[in-house]
UniProtKB/Swiss-Prot annotation:
Stretches for region Disordered: 174-204
GO biological process, one term: fusion of virus membrane with host plasma membrane
Parts of the chain on the Virion surface side: 19-803
Intravirion-facing ranges: 825-838
Record's subcellular location: Virion membrane; Host cell membrane; Host endosome membrane
Keyword Membrane: yes
Assembly and oligomerization: Interacts with glycoprotein L (gL); this interaction is necessary for the correct processing and cell surface expression of gH. The heterodimer gH/gL seems to interact with gB trimers during fusion.
Residues carrying a glycan: 73, 120, 216, 332, 437, 670, 784
Positions of region (Interaction with gL): 259-323
Biological role: The heterodimer glycoprotein H-glycoprotein L is required for the fusion of viral and plasma membranes leading to virus entry into the host cell. Following initial binding to host receptor, membrane fusion is mediated by the fusion machinery composed of gB and the heterodimer gH/gL. May also be involved in the fusion between the virion envelope and the outer nuclear membrane during virion morphogenesis.
Protein name from the UniProt record: Envelope glycoprotein H
Family of the protein in this entry: Belongs to the herpesviridae glycoprotein H family.
Length: 838
């Protein structure tokens, strides 16, 4: 290719990377395999013509910009002479896997363009001085094509011909945010640095971890060396091909994907490359480099002005952030604002926990429940915070040389939980298509850590009785994300949910943070098998029971209290000293089969329990509705219903009823009750009486059969039984609903003590979850499809008379009595003959 081309390649790579390469140079394997294929280079053996490449026609832009220069006068006759070199150009042959049948394209690229100079600029003079060896930089753009390991990928892109990854750079060039780093606050004004190991603190090997270390996880330090991936040489290639490849020292990767979205974050020393793509929005890319580094755009070589730097906010004291995307100022303003916010996250702190706390709060933001379907702006913000938390975690761990056990387990658990929420709640992913992986640990160390954690999980379940430790055991299984870990803790998790339900029926409080946390991870453990394929019969039965009990725990009062608790916690969290951890505020409603929590009656109940504040009523109502919608959206996994409640999604005649379930009650292993606002064409249907005609309720008993029928609900004061030992009510469900169409509760009758309460009827003055002061109707749903109206548990409306009205009425009676007495006295005086005796 000529000495000039070699000279340009040396200059470009020498300036960018010194004498240190972050890749291994390899010979093209096709060339080695094709040494014996020289006869195929003949284009036409009859006439003896040699193989010749195609060249672009200079008269047909835009590809004509890469045509051979006129001074070479390359023609069909002169091409075989191989006089292709021209001092001011680099020539490149681009072909496909069909080569040599596909002769390829011979392209010419101006050297001035590769050097980032104007087209008419003069080339630098050759130098005989060898470049000085320097320590490899953390980030170095690899300009040029010679020895570039991704040159073929770059050349196959359309970036130089017809495509621009950033059509509107001005839209993505924006001022720095209010909370980003400044000279006086190089880590951000709201940054709370992560804890550092005390001087002389011991670094524990993962193979020696025991339950004592779990008890003291916040003071147990693990050495970074050997635990996290050591920085390794890596070439990062922008998927949009909008900038030159970048040589970095990689430290790991975070990947989140599903059937509707893909997020990939590549971490390096002082570097992050984040790509967010969705089916419903154009892709976006964020690149973080050291403050003094610049990444140039790859553009059309025919442009009069050389491409400038990538767009983004101005550089800060530590980093410079570049933002790439096809959004323009004419596009959706909320999407552009979300991308700008994502571009500011890397400079807003160094503590991974702050970003995870903000991501949880973002999930419950005002627009979280505003609409159905994918919401790209919310997904970008959530995944931007999630990726930045990993960036902060890895950087802090390498900087401190150690990481505490609580931070390691917390980051792995919360990032996995948030990944699921972002995928299902913002991207619209099918629940069984979500995958997530954080590869920041050394592969060997990861295997050792997983083996040790698996052993600790078994030890916790065998020896410990503490609810907090059992919750930690379920969390460890959630972190391990392996079938063996889930199977090991599933029996304990199912027993815990049963125990919490017994406490709830007994009227005891089950709303402490440790209870919420235990319920969060126990529910996740029992629901997880459906992601790995078809669940076994035992797994399906456990999951169905956990879903039924979660629905029973989610009464209307609990739903309203959950809404109030979340609002209070979100208002209190400053994401600095007070963080918002969603598992500590987890509600059984989010793990239930209740999909009616965003209906108006529940919103009014939640508003009625709201404490007095200065928040305007309209804002409070919007927040309440957003939280309720998010809870409903969080719980509604269609794939989960198909896996664990298949009778509810069974198709008859190739079609399923287009009716949205409001509540599902899996009452046996193969039958469920479903509450809807419209009748279903199959199953045993009941129309609930005494309900507002504008919000009717229908109750249907479903199995896998397609027959349909209707029945009337039989009314009884109490359930009469012949056998006092076994009343036959265990397994039934007690359901209460109001005239407004609100289902207040669906309570499982799971023990003998519970069925005795139902048989005895309500006791006046004795509080019970089966009683209510609200006018309502009580039903008993049996596993065989029979439904009974329990008259004794009905609450009838009582006429409420105001005290003022009673006082006025009493005064009126007195006045009327006095008036009558006066009239009688007048009559006796005026008509004396009425009183004479004959």
């Amino acid at each position: 290719m000529g000495n000039g081309l070699w000279f340009v390649g040396v200059i470009i790579l020498g300036a960018a990377w010194g004498q240190v390469h972050d890749w291994t140079e390899q010979t093209d394997p096709w060339f080695l395999d094709g040494l014996g294929m020289d006869r195929m280079y003949w284009r036409d053996t009859n006439t003896g013509r040699l193989w010749l490449p195609n060249t672009p026609d200079p008269q047909k832009p835009p590809r004509g910009f890469l045509a051979p220069p006129d001074e070479l006068n390359l023609t069909t006759a002169s091409l075989p002479l191989l006089r292709w070199y021209e001092e001011r150009f680099c020539f490149v042959l681009v072909t496909t896997a069909e080569f040599p049948r596909d002769p390829g394209q011979l392209l010419y690229i101006p050297k001035t363009y590769l050097l980032g100079r104007p087209p008419n600029a003069s080339l630098p003079a050759p130098t005989t001085v060898e470049p000085t060896a320097q320590p490899p930089p953390a980030v170095a753009p690899l300009k040029g094509l010679l020895h570039n390991p991704t040159a073929s990928v770059l050349l196959r892109s359309r970036a130089w011909v017809t495509f621009s990854a950033v059509p509107d750079p001005e839209a993505l060039t924006f001022p720095r945010g209010d909370n980003v780093a400044t000279a006086s606050h190089p880590s951000g004004p709201r940054d709370t640095p992560p804890p550092r190991p005390p001087v002389g603190a011991r670094r524990h090997p993962t193979t020696e971890l025991d339950i004592t270390h779990l008890h003291n996880a916040s003071t147990t330090w693990l050495a970074t060396r050997g635990l996290l991936r050591s920085p390794g040489r890596y070439v990062y290639f922008s998927p949009s091909a909008s900038t030159w490849p970048v040589g970095i020292w990689t430290t790991g990767e975070l990947v989140l994907g599903c059937d509707a979205a893909l997020v990939r974050a590549r971490y390096g020393r002082e570097f992050m490359g984040l790509v967010i793509s969705m089916h419903d929005s154009p892709p976006a890319e964020v690149m973080v480099v050291p403050a003094g580094q610049t990444l140039d755009r790859v553009g059309d070589p025919a442009d009069e002005n050389p491409p400038g730097a990538l767009p983004g906010p101005p550089g800060g004291p530590r980093y410079r952030v570049f933002v790439l995307g096809s959004l323009t100022r004419a596009d959706n303003g909320s999407a552009l604002d979300a991308l700008r916010r994502v571009g500011g996250y890397p400079e807003e702190g160094t503590n991974y926990a702050q970003f995870l706390s903000r991501a949880y709060a973002e999930f419950f933001s005002g627009d979280a429940g505003a609409e159905q379907g994918p919401r790209p702006p919310l997904f970008w913000r959530l995944t931007g915070l999630l990726a930045t938390s990993g960036f902060a975690f890895v950087n802090a761990a390498h900087a401190n040389g150690a990481v505490c056990l609580s931070d390691l387990l917390g980051f792995l658990a919360h990032s996995r939980a948030l990944a699921g929420l972002a995928a299902r709640g913002a991207a619209g992913c099918a629940a069984d298509s979500v995958f997530f992986n954080v590869s920041v640990l050394d592969p060997t160390a990861r295997l050792q850590l997983e083996a040790r954690l698996q052993h600790l999980v078994a030890e916790i379940l065998e020896r410990e009785q503490s609810l907090a430790l059992h919750a930690l055991g379920y969390q460890l299984a959630f972190v391990l994300d392996s079938p063996s870990a889930y199977d090991a803790v599933a029996p304990s998790a199912a027993h815990l949910i049963d125990a919490l339900y017994a406490e709830f029926l007994g009227g005891r409080v089950v709303t402490t943070p440790v209870v919420h946390r235990a319920l969060f991870y126990a529910s996740a453990v029992l629901r997880q098998p459906f992601l790995a394929g078809v669940p076994s019969a035992v797994q399906r039965e456990r999951a169905r029971r956990s879903l039924l009990i979660a629905s029973a725990l989610c009464t209307s009062d609990v739903a309203a209290a959950t809404n109030a608790d979340l609002r209070t916690a979100l208002a209190r969290a400053d994401h600095q000293k007070t963080l918002f951890w969603l598992p500590d505020h987890f509600s059984p409603c989010a793990a239930s089969l209740r999909f009616d929590l965003d209906e108006s009656v529940f919103i009014l109940d939640a508003l009625a329990q709201a404490t007095r504040s200065e928040t305007p009523v309209e804002v409070l109502a919007q927040q309440t509705h957003g939280l309720a919608s998010t809870l409903t959206r969080w719980a509604h996994y269609n794939a989960l219903i198909r896996a664990f409640v298949p009778e509810a999604s069974h198709r008859c005649g190739g079609q399923s009823a287009n009716v949205e379930p409001r509540i599902l009650v899996p009452i046996t292993h193969n039958a469920s009750y479903v509450v809807t606002h419209s009748p279903l064409p199959r199953g045993i249907g009941y129309k609930l009486t005494g309900v507002d005609v504008r919000r009717p309720l229908f109750l249907t008993y479903l199995t896998a059969t397609c027959e349909g029928s209707t029945r009337d609900i039989e009314s009884k004061r109490l359930v009469r039984t012949q056998n006092q030992r076994d009343l036959g009510l265990v397994g039934a469900v007690f359901m209460r609903y109001t005239p407004a169409g609100e289902v207040m509760s669906v309570l499982l009758v799971d023990t003998d003590n519970t069925q005795q309460q139902i048989a005895a009827g309500p006791t006046e003055g004795a509080p019970s979850v089966f009683s209510s002061d609200v006018p309502s109707t009580a039903l008993l749903l049996f596993p065989n499809g029979t439904v009974i109206h329990l008259l004794a548990f009905d609450t009838q409306p009582v006429a409420a008379i105001a005290p003022g009205f009673l006082a006025a009425s009493a005064l009126g009676v007195v006045m009327i009595t006095a008036a009558l007495a006066g009239i009688l006295k007048v009559l006796r005086t005026s008509v004396p003959f009425f009183w004479r005796r004959e």
